[in-house]
C-alpha cells in the first residue's frame, strides 16, 4: 500500500510530500551529509584554462621562456663524460634563442681548445653573449685537438645555455651550461611573472658569502680533444696534475687537491708531475650541494692512502745528456741527480684558498704519505730556448691498501665542498719548496735521475673566482645569427630522455633538492611552472606549483627513498601535464592560423571550448600526504589505545552519512503515515 498509496496521492498532498523531500535534500546539501554521491569541490578550473576558450590569439606576453639544465635529470657531468656529448661539424650555421630565466647550475664548462697548428678551434662569442651567471663549479678545459669542423654542436640536440641566450654552438672562453629551453603559458594576470630584474646583480651581492652564491673554477688540460683517445689532466697547479681515467665528482677533485697541497706532494721544481688515481678508489664521493651549507662528502681522502709510483712513459733516453744540479731559478735549464724535490716534504702548514672573495685556511694532514719509486725513461721536450731537455713525468698511485677501520669516518656536518676548494697558487713554479732541497728525505729513491723543465704555458690558479663581468646581453636579433626558438631541438621531445638518475655504487643518493632561478624575484609565482613544454633530451620535465619550497620532500623523496607509489604519481603527473600543455599549445597555434577568419570559436561555435583541467594541485597534495604519512612519520604501535580511537574516528563521516540516510527514510515514512 505504501508505494501504491504514494502514486495515488491527490495533487495537494503530493505537493506537500515533494516539499518535505526537497527540504531534506537541501538540508543535506547545506550540511554536506553524504547520500552516497561524493563531490570533490577542490577541483577548480584556473585562469590558464580559460585562455583556451578565447576567440583570438592571446598576447605573446603570456609565454615565458626558461632554461632548464640537463644535469637535473642525472646526466654525467664530469668532463670526460660531458665532452663526449659534443662534436664538431661544418656547414651548419649556429642558432641562438633568448630565454628569460635560468636555473642555477651545479656544473658549467669553459673551453679554450686550439688546433695542432696553434689556431683556435672555437669561435669567439658574439657581442651580447656572456657566460652563464650561476655555476657552482666551472670546469675550465684548455688543450689541443683536431677539431674537425667549424663549430662544436651538441650531439643530442640540446642547447648550450649562456646568460639569457641559448646557442647551438660552444663559444671560446665563455662559460656555459647544457640545457634546454622551456616555455611557460601564463594567464594575463601573471604576465609579469618574471619581473624586471637587473641582468647583473651588484658585485657586493655576489661576493657576500651569506648570499650563498660563490663559484669554484676547476682547471683541466686536454690532449686530443674531441677524439676517442682524449686524455684529461686535472690541474692542481701549473706543474702538478692528476690523470683522469674514470668519472670524478668535483668534490673528489677538491678533496684530492687539498690532500696534495697539505701533504706536500706538489712538484717542487720546474718539472711536470703527474699523478694517477688507482681505479679501486671511489671517485664518486659527495652529493649535490646546490648552494646549501650542508654535509656533502661521505668521507675525506687521507694522506695515508697516497703512495707515489714512478712509471715509464715509453720514451727513450737521449744519449749524451749529462745530469747537472738544480737551481731554484725557473729560468735555469739544468738537470739534477736528485729528484726528491719533485714532491716536497715540507710544504707550508697553512695553505690559503680562495672562494668568491673569502679566504680559508686548510691545515696540514697529520700523516704524510708513503712514497716509493722505480726507474723510468725520460721524455724529451723542447725548452723555451729551443733546446732539448728531459722532462720527468711522475704518477701518483692512490690506493686503499693502508686503510684502517678506525680511519673510516665521515666528515663533520660543517664540511662542504665550498669549504674545501682547491688551493690557489701564484703563476709560475713555486719557489718556497725549493729552498728546502737540502733537507734529507727517505721518501724517494735517489737512483732515478730527473731534469727540470719550464712549464709556464700552463701557469695559473686551479681555483679562481668565476667572475661575471660585461655589459647587458643583447637580444638574439642583434647577434647577426639565425634566431630559432624551437627548430633545433623540437624533434627531441620523444626518444632522448633518461628516465632516472644514474645509480653510482658506493655513493650517496644524488638528487637536485632545490630549484633556483636567477631572474625572478618571487619564488611563490611558480604557478606557471606546471605548464612547461620542454625541448631537447634529458630535460627534467615538469616543475609543478609549490615545488619551489617543498621539492625536498617531493623530488628527493622520490629518488632517495624510492617510494614506488610516489614515483608512479609523479610520472602520471608528468604525462598528464605534458598532454595538457601540448593541447593548449596546439589550440593557440590553431587560433593563430584561423585568426583572419575570426578564430576557432567563430568557426566552430560553442563546441570550440575545451578545458583540459589541471590536476597538478591534487596530485601534489596526494604526494605530500604519502610522504607525510609513510616517510616522515614512524608507524604507530598497533597496541596503542590512540590507534583504536583513530581507527574508530575515521568511521565518523561514513556513520554520519548512513545516519542521514536513515533519518531521511524515517522522515519520509512518517510523512506518508501522516498523509494517510
Swiss-Prot record:
Compositionally biased tracts (Low complexity): 414-432
Keyword field contains Coiled coil: yes
Residues bearing carbohydrate: 40, 204, 228, 238, 257, 268, 296, 317, 333, 346, 386, 413, 436, 454, 462, 563, 618
Chain segments carrying region Mucin-like region: 305-485
Chain intervals for the UniProt region annotation (Disordered): 315-337, 373-392, 402-479
Gene Ontology cellular component terms for the protein in this record: extracellular region; host cell plasma membrane; membrane; viral envelope; virion membrane
Cytoplasmic side: 672-676
Transmembrane helix listed as a keyword: yes
Lipid modification (S-palmitoyl cysteine), residues: 670, 672
Coiled-coil ranges per UniProt: 554-595, 615-634
Free-text comment about domains: The mucin-like region seems to be involved in the cytotoxic function. This region is also involved in binding to human CLEC10A. The coiled coil regions play a role in oligomerization and fusion activity.
Protein name: Envelope glycoprotein
UniProt organism field: Zaire ebolavirus (strain Eckron-76) (ZEBOV)
Amino acid at each position: 500500500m505504501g508505494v501504491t498509496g504514494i502514486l495515488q496521492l491527490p495533487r495537494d498532498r503530493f505537493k506537500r510530500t515533494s516539499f518535505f523531500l526537497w527540504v531534506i535534500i537541501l538540508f543535506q546539501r547545506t550540511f554536506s551529509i553524504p547520500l552516497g554521491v561524493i563531490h570533490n569541490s577542490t577541483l577548480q578550473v584556473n585562469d590558464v584554462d580559460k585562455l583556451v576558450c578565447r576567440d583570438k590569439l592571446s598576447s605573446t606576453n603570456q609565454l615565458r621562456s626558461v632554461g632548464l639544465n640537463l644535469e637535473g635529470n642525472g646526466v654525467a657531468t664530469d668532463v670526460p663524460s660531458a665532452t663526449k656529448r659534443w662534436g664538431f661539424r661544418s656547414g651548419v650555421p649556429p642558432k641562438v634563442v633568448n630565454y628569460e630565466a635560468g636555473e642555477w647550475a651545479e656544473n658549467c664548462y669553459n673551453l679554450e681548445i686550439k688546433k695542432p697548428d696553434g689556431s683556435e678551434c672555437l669561435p669567439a662569442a658574439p657581442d651580447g653573449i656572456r657566460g652563464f651567471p650561476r655555476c657552482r663549479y666551472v670546469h675550465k678545459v684548455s688543450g689541443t685537438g683536431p677539431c674537425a669542423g667549424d663549430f662544436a654542436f651538441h650531439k643530442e640536440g640540446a642547447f648550450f645555455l649562456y646568460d639569457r641566450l641559448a646557442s647551438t654552438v660552444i663559444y671560446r672562453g665563455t662559460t656555459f651550461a647544457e640545457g634546454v629551453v622551456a616555455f611557460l603559458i601564463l594567464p594575463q594576470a601573471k604576465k609579469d611573472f618574471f619581473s624586471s630584474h637587473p641582468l647583473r646583480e651588484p658585485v657586493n651581492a655576489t661576493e657576500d658569502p651569506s648570499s650563498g652564491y660563490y663559484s669554484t673554477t676547476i682547471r683541466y688540460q686536454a690532449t686530443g680533444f674531441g677524439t676517442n683517445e682524449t686524455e684529461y689532466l686535472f690541474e692542481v697547479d701549473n706543474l702538478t696534475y692528476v690523470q683522469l681515467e674514470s668519472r670524478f665528482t668535483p668534490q673528489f677533485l677538491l678533496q684530492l687537491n687539498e690532500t696534495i697541497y697539505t701533504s706536500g706532494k706538489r712538484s717542487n721544481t720546474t718539472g711536470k708531475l703527474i699523478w694517477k688515481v688507482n681505479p679501486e678508489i671511489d671517485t664518486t664521493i659527495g652529493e649535490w650541494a646546490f648552494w646549501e651549507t650542508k654535509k656533502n662528502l661521505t668521507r675525506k681522502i687521507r694522506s695515508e692512502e697516497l703512495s707515489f709510483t714512478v712509471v715509464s712513459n715509453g720514451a727513450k733516453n737521449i744519449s749524451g745528456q749529462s745530469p747537472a744540479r738544480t737551481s731554484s731559478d725557473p729560468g735555469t735549464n739544468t738537470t739534477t741527480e736528485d729528484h726528491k724535490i719533485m714532491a716536497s716534504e715540507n710544504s707550508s702548514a697553512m695553505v690559503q684558498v680562495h672562494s668568491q672573495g673569502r679566504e680559508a685556511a686548510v691545515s696540514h694532514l697529520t700523516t704524510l704519505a708513503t712514497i716509493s719509486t722505480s726507474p723510468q725513461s725520460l721524455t724529451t721536450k723542447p725548452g723555451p730556448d729551443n733546446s732539448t731537455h728531459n722532462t720527468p713525468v711522475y704518477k701518483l698511485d692512490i690506493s686503499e691498501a693502508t686503510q684502517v677501520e678506525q680511519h673510516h669516518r665521515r666528515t663533520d656536518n660543517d664540511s662542504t665542498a665550498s669549504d674545501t676548494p682547491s688551493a690557489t697558487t701564484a703563476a709560475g713554479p713555486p719557489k718556497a719548496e725549493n729552498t728546502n732541497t737540502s733537507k734529507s728525505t727517505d721518501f724517494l729513491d735517489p737512483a732515478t735521475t730527473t731534469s727540470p723543465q719550464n712549464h709556464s704555458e700552463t701557469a695559473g690558479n686551479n681555483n679562481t673566482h668565476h667572475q661575471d663581468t660585461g655589459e647587458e646581453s643583447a637580444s638574439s636579433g642583434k647577434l647577426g645569427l639565425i634566431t630559432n626558438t624551437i627548430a633545433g631541438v623540437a624533434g627531441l621531445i620523444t626518444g632522448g630522455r633518461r628516465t632516472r638518475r644514474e645509480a653510482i655504487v658506493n655513493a650517496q643518493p644524488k638528487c637536485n633538492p632545490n630549484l633556483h632561478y636567477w631572474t625572478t624575484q618571487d619564488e611563490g609565482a611558480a604557478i606557471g611552472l606546471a605548464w612547461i613544454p620542454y625541448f631537447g633530451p634529458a630535460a627534467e620535465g615538469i616543475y609543478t606549483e609549490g615545488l619551489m619550497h617543498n621539492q625536498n620532500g617531493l623530488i628527493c623523496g622520490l629518488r632517495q627513498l624510492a617510494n614506488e607509489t610516489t614515483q608512479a604519481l609523479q610520472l602520471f603527473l608528468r604525462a598528464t601535464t605534458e598532454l595538457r600543455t601540448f593541447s593548449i599549445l596546439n589550440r593557440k597555434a590553431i587560433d593563430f592560423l584561423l585568426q583572419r577568419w575570426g578564430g576557432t570559436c567563430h568557426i566552430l561555435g560553442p563546441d570550440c571550448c575545451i578545458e583540459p583541467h589541471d590536476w597538478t594541485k591534487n596530485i601534489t597534495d596526494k604526494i605530500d600526504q604519502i610522504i607525510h604519512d609513510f616517510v616522515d612519520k614512524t608507524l604507530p604501535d598497533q597496541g596503542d589505545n590512540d590507534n583504536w580511537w583513530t581507527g574508530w574516528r575515521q568511521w565518523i563521516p561514513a556513520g554520519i552519512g548512513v545516519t542521514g540516510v536513515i533519518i531521511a527514510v524515517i522522515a519520509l515514512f512518517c510523512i506518508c503515515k501522516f498523509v494517510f
